[in-house]
Design a protein with these regions (language model features):
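HIT superfamily nucleotide-processing domains
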Residues: 1-139
């Protein structure tokens, strides 16, 4: 995996507005925020995409993410927020180190804007897909 700006932030070579840090996780304010309070939560483990992250680091992120969401809601006074995580360029990942965005949504125009055409899941396709995924998880 190529070095990223996040590796340099983790090592302290690039400064950040740190919100939280432990042995496995670092959280800091985004320098190009979509809204006031936009934060990033990253594992210290180097992994390009979420599927490559260890279960241990994923669990550490899972313990920290809700706490940071609560703190951001309280401090910004915003009740609505998005948690966003992208994997690979096609899915809009720009920094190739797993990271989660917490983006406060104070109004319709600020924060993350999301619109997509909802599809319809065919019952037969859904049953077949679910069975295949369950089998893969058991492997």
């Amino acid at each position: 995996m190529a070095e990223t700006v996040f590796d340099k932030i983790i090592r302290g070579e690039i400064p950040c507005h740190k919100l939280y840090e432990d042995e496995q996780v670092l959280a800091f304010l985004d320098v190009a925020p979509l809204s006031f309070g936009h934060a990033l939560v990253i594992p210290k483990e180097r992994a390009k995409t979420l599927d490559l992250l260890s279960d241990d680091s994923a669990a550490a992120i899972g313990r920290v993410l809700p706490r940071l969401c609560r703190a951001l809601k309280h401090i910004t006074g915003v009740s609505a927020f998005n948690v966003l995580q992208n994997n690979e360029s096609l899915a809009h990942q720009a920094v190739f180190h797993v990271h989660f965005h917490i983006i406060p949504k104070p109004d319709e125009k600020s924060g993350l804007g999301v619109a997509w055409p909802a599809g319809k899941l065919d019952a037969g396709q859904g049953a077949e897909l679910a069975a295949r995924i369950v089998k893969e998880l058991a492997a």
